[in-house]
Amino acid sequence: MTRRNKAQRNLKTDARMTPYDVKVKGTFAEPPKKEKLPPRKPTSEEQRANNLAPVEFSRESASVGNWIPLFRKELAEMNSGKVGRPYSFCDSMIIWIISLQTLIKGTYRTAAGLAAAILEDHGMKAPSYSRLFERSAEMLDRMLSENGGTYIIRAGSNIIDSPRNVGIDSSGFNLSNTCLWRKEKWGTGPKRRGWLKLHVLSDVDTGEVIAFAVTDKNTGDSPLMIPLLDAAVAAGHRIGIVYADGAYSSAENFDHVCGRLGTRFVTSFKVNTKPVNGGSRYRGEATRLWCSMPYAEWVEKSGYGRRWKSECGFSDVKRLFGESIHAFTMKGAVRKLLMKTETFSRYKEQRAILLSGCLASS
């Protein structure tokens, strides 16, 4: 490109500038640079809860004496008034067995053998491998039918009286059985089978999972925000401030959070965002604040720095239960990711209880 063409291009770019692009100093506004802020270290109470949570969660999961009364009560309710052969296994028993499988990173056959050894010692019949597989598949089909077969949305039962400040984010889980050594030595690896996407609405204070959705990799982030919030509210959760990254900064999400739910929505924007409404007056107020100050100052004033907790959840679930999903069929992969998330949700609930105890004793 010649010097003359460059000058003409710069002139056209300046001509497209609007009055909103001019700062108080009288110069053209530069996009707010997203500075890298220093990482926040966990407090002593949080570190203690992090250390105790795996021990207490494993103990609670393996303590079958706490689960047997629940199994018997649910079986009695299922068989009440039933004509014909009575039920032998309740849904909570199937979920408990698959949770053990997720916890030990085993197979269905391993979980069936472990359940047989535990339940038969307490006078209860354990499901076989084939029955365990069939019942888990039936539960997945039931969840898929609730949303038209496109995705799964689940809301947590960890309801409290006070509003929760929540963050939303998504991450992918690998469906390929990758082998890094084969790639390192021979320069080849298995064919990619794709990804599953997990969308999580979590409590930024405790890390608990409030609601989550499982979709394919092509599903966008922004369209899942409203269904996740609606699922959480329908389950009885009270929503406080909602934190999200720039992928969720649509006018529809602003109208839903600020208008319908009546709460604050804190999200970032693209660096070239202009302070205009863009279809929502709530979004216009947020963009004007975004463009009026440097990034570090905006983070401090808006409270956006709390959003990082929603990303930590994905790091935790992949570290505890693995990032890859080993299954032959897509339904099997969805079922395994679903149980990973359900088990992780119970783990975070246990951590929240420990954290509240640590804070109370300090």
Protein language model annotation of sequence segments:
Residues 69-76, 112, 116, 314, ...:
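Amphipathic, well-packed alpha-helical segments that form the structural scaffold of globular domains
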Residues 51-103:
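Basic, short loop/linker segments at the boundary and entry of helix-turn-helix/winged-helix-like folds
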Residues 3-4, 37-40, 246-318:
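Helix-centered, glycine/charged polyanion-binding patches within enzymatic domains
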Residues 298-362:
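Basic, amphipathic alpha-helical segments enriched in Lys/Arg and hydrophobic/aromatic residues
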Residues 1-20, 28-44, 306:
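Short Lys/Arg-rich cationic patches that frequently serve as NLS/NoLS or arginine-rich RNA/DNA-binding motifs
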Residues 2, 86, 95, 100-103, ...:
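Polybasic low-complexity intrinsically disordered regions
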Residues 100, 126, 247-258, 264, ...:
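Acidic/histidine-rich catalytic cores and adjacent linkers
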Residues 81-151:
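Short, positively charged, Gly/Tyr-enriched micro-motifs
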